[in-house]
Regions:
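Conserved micro-motifs of the catalytic ATP-binding
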Residues: 35-38, 107
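Glycine-rich ATP-binding loops of the HATPase_c
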Residues: 127-134
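ATP-lid-like helix-loop hinge signature
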Residues: 55-78
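Short alpha-helical Gxxx[C/S/T] motif in the catalytic ATP-binding
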Residues: 115, 119
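Conserved catalytic submotifs in the C-terminal HATPase_c
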Residues: 24-34
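A conserved beta-strand-to-alpha-helix junction within the catalytic ATP-binding
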Residues: 2-14
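Short conserved segment of the HATPase_c
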Residues: 94-104
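Detector for a conserved hydrophobic position within an alpha-helical segment of the HATPase_c
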Residues: 123-124
Length: 152
């Protein structure tokens, strides 16, 4: 693990995701730079996976309403010891957030059911906490990730 600027990494992940995205992705951070010890490639994988999951959820909404516009809001807040990342989307939500963390469980025709368990494992390897829940039934997902912060 090495010292990385999480704000910069998320911005890069968003730029990469936007190349194939039709959704609106908003990003807000109270700090211009926030440092953590991490594996840049693995954390990038986390952020891309979470954005991709939202995109896939939006497809179901678009089937019901062709004018639907997917929105992903990503926000970082920090205190003295931890940063908290919040990913919110306005997709269909997750039927059972606990089951979604079970390897090989999927509700998608093409999914492997490994995305969220891998994301959780990567966050745990970074001494972090990964939480997932619905904002409201059928109204989107809220994912919270806490990671230990280090000094600049």
């Amino acid at each position: 693990l090495k010292k990385i600027d999480l704000v910069s990494l998320i911005e890069k992940s968003i730029e990469f995701a936007k190349m194939s995205s039709k959704s609106l992705i908003n990003f807000k951070s109270n700090d211009q730079m926030i440092f953590i010890n991490g594996d840049e490639d693995q954390l990038n994988r986390v952020f891309i996976n979470l954005i991709k999951n939202s995109e896939e959820a939006f497809l179901e909404n678009i089937k019901k309403d062709p004018n639907f516009k997917g929105i992903i809001n990503i926000e970082i807040n920090s205190n003295n010891d931890y940063i908290v990342l919040e990913f919110k989307d306005n997709g269909q939500g997750i039927l059972d957030p606990k089951k979604a963390m079970t390897p090989y469980f999927t509700t998608k025709k093409t999914g492997t059911g490994l995305g969220l368990p891998i994301v959780s494992k990567i966050i745990n390897e970074h001494a972090g906490i990964f939480l997932i829940d619905n904002i409201k039934k059928g109204k989107g997902v809220l994912i919270k990730i806490s990671l230990p912060k280090i000094d600049a």
